Amino acid sequence: MEKREDGGILTYDGRYVMYNVLGNIFELSSKYIPPIEPIGRGAYGIVCCATNSETNEEVAIKKIANAFDNRVDAKRTLREIKLLSHMDHDNVIKIKDIIELPEKERFEDVYIVYELMDTDLHQIIRSTQTLTDDHCQYFLYQILRGLKYIHSANVLHRDLKPSNLVLNTNCDLKICDFGLARTSNETEIMTEYVVTRWYRAPELLLNSSEYTGAIDIWSVGCIFMEILRRETLFPGKDYVQQLKLITELLGSPDDSDLDFLRSDNARKYVKQLPHVQKQSFREKFPNISPMALDLAEKMLVFDPSKRITVDEALKQPYLASLHEINEEPTCPTPFSFDFEETALDEQDIKELVWRESLHFKNM
């Protein structure tokens, strides 16, 4: 194996180069050139930046090591790839490439190449950077604009949180991480771990099996308040405290707010919680603009059927200076989750991811 000056080791007759990044091996097609630097890590693995020498474009490359070792994680990877390949919107992250090695037998690690962004909303909220009302409006507008497109494709994101909203230095925002997304006409109860607790809608906390795009709107309401306040709105330590924090602000739900709960146990549980009055948003948050609070309050409604929709949210006065119906496209065709319906094992999923990677060969 020939070693290059930049530390890379040539493989497959120089068509691929192997780099060591913080002890992680990245084996990339040779068009991706250094500097190869780590820019983030998550439960799935590590993300690096590199440059595509053919387009001169900087990209982010996520390595999912041993991607097919277990079925749940493998399906999550397949779902993310299929969904993002289907979508094409300014406020949804784009997949640029999937790097696969020439030998299918060695296809164990998946490298997904995305457009490169500079930061995420979690980091911005936690920073000392001043956020004006214009910033807050623009962030919220882009989240809703992207979500309108996602919901129009019959997709629920289900894991919206500040760290899944990435930005560049122009404040352009894109929604990422679709590994937990589902179709909006699916009724099966979600079994796997979904949505960071702090952004989880009441119907999910109470295990309702019927959920809609309203779960994403709740998350957006929590994120919006976090942008405005620079701190988490409902930082529950567990499910019980999460519901308690929600009812302390919104007040105890009355019977008509619990129609969405099919389970008698869930209804009983909510009814036995201490009865509390709704707090006035304007009194509790006097430093936030009334128009912003009015919109947040319409998103943060206990009963999902009474929660504002993404289309209604875009028409609210707070976003009047940005809202332009003709500039808020929908997805031309709904996304099909058919591949979820067959009983796929790890090898089947591997084959499907391999096929997805071939689509990028001719691009």
UniProtKB/Swiss-Prot annotation:
ATP binds at residues 39-47, 62. Expressed in roots, stems and flower buds. It catalyses: L-seryl-[protein] + ATP = O-phospho-L-seryl-[protein] + ADP + H(+); L-threonyl-[protein] + ATP = O-phospho-L-threonyl-[protein] + ADP + H(+). Residues 33-319 form the Protein kinase domain. GO terms for molecular function: ATP binding; MAP kinase activity; protein serine kinase activity. The modification Phosphothreonine is found at residues 191, 196. Its EC number is 2.7.11.24. Dually phosphorylated on Thr-191 and Tyr-193, which activates the enzyme. Keywords: ATP-binding, Kinase, Nucleotide-binding, Phosphoprotein, Serine/threonine-protein kinase, Transferase. The keyword Plastid does not apply. The modification Phosphotyrosine is found at residue 193. Interacts with MKK6. The TXY motif contains the threonine and tyrosine residues whose phosphorylation activates the MAP kinases. MKK6-MPK13 module positively regulates lateral root formation. The active site is at residue 159. Belongs to the protein kinase superfamily. CMGC Ser/Thr protein kinase family. MAP kinase subfamily. Activated by threonine and tyrosine phosphorylation. Activated by the MAP kinase kinase MKK6 in vitro. This is Mitogen-activated protein kinase 13. It is an enzyme of class 2 (transferase). Disruption phenotype: RNAi MPK13 displays fewer lateral roots. GO terms for biological process: lateral root formation. A motif (TXY) lies at residues 191-193.
